[in-house]
């Protein structure tokens, strides 16, 4: 019987596994990089072992260090979580060779299925050996791991070499394996997957289907179970194929078989030999704890001959610290507060006061709703996200709400091209003038408490804020009866609560301020200085860091004075395990190069300057 478990992972999945272990009376041990010294998963574990360093290659991808940590902590078993080494057969063998229990499939099954190239061969499919114009578009894909890393869509042959190079680097950074392959890219299909669970006694369960079609950068954003709109025949066919794939490699534990469904035809994508991020929707529908089932299977227990019956519908949304309107750029900073209403499940990797850094995935949490019908579950999740309190970096919360309420999603007609078609509309955020006014009035109340006054009280005060990247101006007045503004009756105003009445309708606004960061209900504003200070102007052609991150590469031979072509890649940044290429904005000469490989950069930092000849 397992009495103690080390989780070879971090963040949300480590916290989630620890929760089940605590419920079962199992002692928990975390591993934590120096960047994660005070992370939530390190705080909630019974014990923590340090992994010296910050980047994944030095820490969470060092299987040797993790095995040493497990032995030093005296645990019985190792759970890999997802990502990092979760689909690394060598790591699984090292755990077993150390005399520990591996909570996952046999190394041989991982070798057969975790490598996408091997899995496709097993399923009778071959990757492309040579790409021609007729093959386009194609998808460059990491052979190991998942989560959208190491993937590039190529629509022009001249882009293939760059896509291969970028995918290899990203895959090596995320999974410790730079192998990639190329396959045909199916446009606008639906991403459907089947959850399986197998024991050591020959029983394999297919736990229904999931739809994970809403994706950005090939990484899932919203998932649900069961997949809506499938014929009973197709749903059964997919589950039968998944069971056959598991039996073909003597699979044990949880796994996911993924398909792309287009025009009623299913195309095998891959098998993930690990727990998936989206496993909670299956848990909700089947009334299971899949982590508990993993532990039971690892202890040798047999599954029942048949799985439990599915009940209702579940939908999950991934809350990311990112700006969808700015090329999904990762965001950093302090997460001041994160709460969701009762009635939904929150799986979080961060708690109030945690710092969101640049080294790891930007996912803050997953929010899951379960209800008798799909429509009820979707409504419940959208409402919970709308009422959630999320104070801190910019997030994708608004995008999630609008996606869930979009007619294409509510009618279950979505596919993997959803955000290609609708991102611009979904990220267009019309300003709410009353929310902006509430921010200004709350600020005015705070200032008045500390002696703020004017010689001309009848003159309007002006405050300026940015909302979704746009600047807005707000005017209000101090009167003998208190604060006032045109077109609205100020019922109440203090530092944290403003009540306004507009045309007989009262609205309450909860306000919180952290420095220049202002949150009014679920809107995030930035307060601008009352008296703007002049700033140095950037030279034309300046290339600024679009996000905080690490410079991983400078174009070969690039020095000050080099001639460059418009669109030519110059600097490669890595943030939260994703690479971003900074290209020349025009044809000309490089007049400044301010960074070197390995350097940490902040948002807006000057990287280089390109000027026309």
Report the location of each language-model feature.
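N-terminal beta-alpha lobe that positions the nucleotide/phosphoryl donor
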Residues: 1-257, 261-278
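Short, well-ordered beta-strand elements within core beta-sheets of diverse protein domains
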Residues: 151-153, 184, 230, 363-372, ...
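Short amphipathic alpha-helical segments
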Residues: 149-150, 223-226, 361-367, 541
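Catalytic P-loop NTP-binding/switch module of NTPases
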Residues: 506-546
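Structured functional modules or segments
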Residues: 534-613
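Catalytic cores of soluble metabolic enzymes centered on carboxylation/carboxyl-transfer
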Residues: 242, 280-283, 288-486, 566-569, ...
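Residue-level recognition of beta-strand microenvironments
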Residues: 185, 349, 370, 493, ...
